[in-house]
């Protein structure tokens, strides 16, 4: 992606955004200086709640898995809100002292553990998780932008991304002469109908050495007992069955259901806070909205990028208008694996701040460092949109509704479309909505 950053005043003049209200004060924010290999500024950890109580069968399961000296591949599955994410955090901490580094394949696009919503990602973790209740953003070794919070819309693309990530892990970390890292696979909570079929495909492709089945008290929601995915002749893995943690007391509960849509919004807010230096206080959505409005965007010529629509078809004449005021995945065609179902690697997310059709320019805000942006030539547009909590800040004109395209899409239309964002959709059970937190 060829781009240039001009001075803040020059850039904002080129956009002609709506006139800000008289009460708004300028809020210039510097960009963080980070090397390509350095992780993004850490988000301050949330306050720790009551003491975490680990169920006895969970402790026995993590002990049994950590005693396996053959670098296990562990797949954790069960219905929505049964505790899969929390169990994988416990297991990750249990494996780290023995191996030093542990692979973590996150396949839940609705409630990712370490990435923003809409992503499948592989992480190589080398430090323990200190907060069992709240997931924290981490830099991914590899990431695929699926572009939705549910795999129901395009199961084939979802599985292609998952298989690509697992193949990459095997080739880099489990081939002869490599470290032979263990791997934890966290799966979505959609385990009925097509969701069950997709889980079976995952199990058959990955061939885990250990499968952890989490069961709830509602029998109709549970997966079948035993090795339900095998057809005969395959190597049988070890199956460990545990119960979902009880919730009888908030002070001693291992799990607490949270609003899935709200958690997705908060995760995106935390992601785009990385656009700013870690010493800048952005404690409220209002502060973040002002900061994003003041941040000089990157200028991206139309000729330098191709827009890929992941879940819809858009007329060629409307391609550039369609990405205005949206979140896009930033990817490179050069790094796309040469496979039958090629899925480009995603280096991060960006907000299309505005579109200048006459000059052929996009204006993009992203926390991705300049070195990684040099190779970006694909914008992946899905259904992940700007958090409503940022758009609805009073006294701050949204910077994402550029008047450059008002003849095609009015600000009112864009505002309405964001109110119907998939981030605020009712959870349909295919992800761990509300997350399993300790």
Q: Model-predicted segments: where are they?
A:
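Preference for solvent-exposed, low-hydrophobicity sequence contexts
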Residues: 1-72, 76, 90, 94, ...
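Nucleotide-state-sensitive switch-loop elements of NTP-binding domains
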Residues: 53-56, 61, 69-74, 103-183, ...
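A generic secondary-structure signal
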Residues: 63-64, 91-94, 164-172, 201-202
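The conserved Walker
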Residues: 80
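Conserved glycine(s) of the Walker
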Residues: 83
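Conserved Walker
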Residues: 86
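Short, structured coil segments at secondary-structure junctions
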Residues: 98, 118, 206-207, 235
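Phosphate/Mg2+-binding loops and adjacent switch elements
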Residues: 171-233
């Amino acid at each position: 992606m060829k781009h240039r950053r001009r001075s803040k005043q020059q850039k904002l003049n080129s956009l002609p955004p709506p006139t800000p209200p008289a009460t708004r004060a300028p809020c210039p924010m510097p960009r963080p200086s980070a090397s390509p290999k350095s992780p993004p500024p850490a988000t301050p950890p949330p306050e720790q709640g009551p003491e975490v109580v680990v169920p006895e069968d969970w402790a026995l399961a993590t002990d049994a898995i950590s005693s396996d000296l053959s670098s296990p591949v562990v797949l954790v599955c069960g219905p929505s809100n049964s505790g899969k994410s929390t169990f994988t955090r416990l297991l990750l901490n249990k494996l780290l002292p023995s191996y030093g580094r542990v692979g973590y394949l996150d396949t839940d696009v609705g409630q990712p553990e370490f990435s923003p919503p809409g992503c499948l990602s592989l992480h190589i973790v080398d430090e323990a998780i200190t907060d069992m209740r709240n997931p924290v953003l981490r830099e991914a070794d590899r990431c695929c932008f699926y572009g939705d919070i549910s795999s129901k819309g395009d199961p084939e693309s979802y599985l292609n991304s998952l298989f690509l990530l697992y193949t990459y892990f095997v080739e880099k970390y489990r081939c002869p002469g490599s470290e032979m890292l263990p791997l934890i696979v966290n799966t979505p909570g959609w385990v009925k109908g097509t969701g069950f079929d997709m889980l079976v495909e995952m199990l058959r492709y990955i061939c885990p050495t250990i499968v952890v089945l989490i069961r709830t008290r509602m029998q109709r929601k549970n997966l079948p007992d035993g090795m339900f995915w095998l057809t005969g002749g395959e190597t049988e893995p070890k199956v460990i069955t545990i119960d979902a943690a009880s919730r009888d007391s908030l002070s001693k509960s291992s799990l607490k259901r949270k609003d899935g849509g709200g958690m997705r919004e908060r995760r995106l807010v935390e992601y785009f806070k990385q656009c700013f230096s870690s010493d800048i206080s952005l404690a409220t959505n209002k502060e973040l909205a002002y900061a994003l409005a003041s941040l000089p965007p990157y200028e991206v010529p139309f000729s330098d990028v191709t827009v890929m629509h992941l879940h819809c078809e858009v007329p060629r004449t409307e391609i550039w208008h369609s990405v205005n005021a949206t979140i896009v995945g930033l990817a490179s065609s050069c790094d796309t694996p040469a496979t039958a179902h090629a899925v480009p690697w995603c280096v991060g997310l960006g907000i299309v701040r505005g579109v200048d059709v006459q000059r052929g320019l996009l204006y993009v805000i992203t926390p991705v460092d300049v070195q990684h942006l040099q190779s970006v030539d694909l914008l992946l547009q899905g259904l992940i949109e700007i958090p409503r909590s940022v758009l609805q800040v009073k006294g701050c004109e949204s910077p994402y509704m550029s008047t450059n395209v008002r003849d095609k899409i009015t600000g009112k239309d864009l505002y309405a479309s964001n109110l119907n964002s998939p981030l605020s959709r009712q959870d349909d059970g295919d992800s761990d909505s509300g997350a399993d937190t300790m």
